[in-house]
A protein has these predicted regions:
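Acidic catalytic loop of the alpha/beta-hydrolase fold
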Residues: 69-75, 104-105
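Alpha/beta-hydrolase active-site loop
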Residues: 1-7
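Alpha/beta-hydrolase fold nucleophile elbow
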Residues: 8-18
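Gly/Ala-rich beta-loop-alpha elbow adjacent to hydrolase catalytic centers
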Residues: 17-22, 26
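Active-site signature of alpha/beta-hydrolase-fold catalytic machinery across serine-
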Residues: 28-32
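A conserved short beta-strand
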Residues: 35-47
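C-terminal catalytic histidine-bearing segment of alpha/beta-hydrolase fold enzymes
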Residues: 80-124
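Short beta-strand/loop motif that positions the catalytic acidic residue
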Residues: 59, 64-67, 71
Length: 124
């Protein structure tokens, strides 16, 4: 929030982008913000404690989850589990992309999908 103030940005001008632990942090923070952000992109992470989210959710920004199907750090099963947890908490705009042949990382196809999502949510 301090950075948003410093940069003179409104929440609707922000898409949160996270990788691995950053995704986990983003999926914890974004739904609990009073002022909804434009969206969130999460690579190779998981939704921690989805049962708590149902009672703690305040805002439901659009969320794009991206995961490599060869990830040996955070299993690919974390993607559908996160999507399911978000939907149970009332999220309607949850999107997913699987990066074929990708381990715990960001591949060009995933980055392209993420950029298109961010452009769409920011109206660019």
């Amino acid at each position: 929030d301090a950075l948003m103030v410093d940069e003179d940005l409104l929440p609707e001008q922000v898409v949160l982008f996270g990788f691995s632990q950053g995704t986990m942090m983003g999926l914890h923070v974004a739904p609990r913000r009073e002022d909804a952000i434009a969206g969130m992109v999460g690579f190779s992470g998981r939704l921690m404690e989805p049962d708590l989210l149902v009672d703690e959710v305040i805002s439901r920004p659009p969320i794009l989850l991206i995961h490599g199907d060869q990830d040996d750090v955070v299993p690919i099963a974390s993607l559908p589990e996160a999507a399911d947890g978000l939907q149970k908490a009332g999220f309607q705009d949850v999107f997913a992309h699987v990066q074929k042949g990708t381990a715990h990382g960001i591949a060009s196809d995933g980055l392209s999908v993420a950029l298109a999502f961010m452009r769409d949510k920011l109206g660019l």
